[in-house]
Amino acid sequence: MLKFVCHGASETTRECTFDALIVAGWTGRDTAALEHHIEELAKIGVPRPSSVPVFYRTSVNGLTQTARLDVLGPDTSGEVEPVLFAIGDDMWLGVGSDHTDRKAETMGIALSKQLCGKPVGRELWLYADVAGHWDKLVIRSWATIDGKRVLYQQGALGIMRRPEELLELYGSTRLAPGAAMFCGTVGAIGGIRPAARFEMELEDPVLRRRLAHVYEVVTLPVIA
């Protein structure tokens, strides 16, 4: 059960359960840049995606609003993403982290997605309220690495496919009630690396508001 403060025509608090979680990958609009990045990752052993974009189904039990995320081993990292939630008849927008096991990623991306929880924030915006200026929304993240807080990601959603296009490519005209979809991310500044703390933000510069969430990453030992 997740609890959200929903900002629409009025502010309401809702307790929600979900029965489907989709993680959309390779959602950028620039296909040439995507192909270049796919080739770069292939050189370090990350398998080529079966399609672009690609949609991974992962366990809905991974959705969490925790402030502490336990992970197995030192090779995981977060990445900020806009997240769609279908609640009742409406679609809502939140912020989340597609935390991923990077070591497992070389064996299979779907496996790497499944191994880590997916933290999400506690506030949502009605998607209809931001649909008209989706391209101007900005995602950011900060990572605490070796005790230093650094800007880890930053980019406008205009470089990513719109939700309507993602849903069409997924094979649906709308997100089914009870489903959530991570919509993709932007590159990591300085490269992907693990962090002890991950802060994420979705900014709406038009309506002058922000969604945010932060969590600590606790690394559990790998015991043979």
Describe each model-derived feature in a short phrase.
Residues 1-176, 180, 187-224:
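Catalytic-core "active-site belt" of small-molecule-metabolizing enzymes
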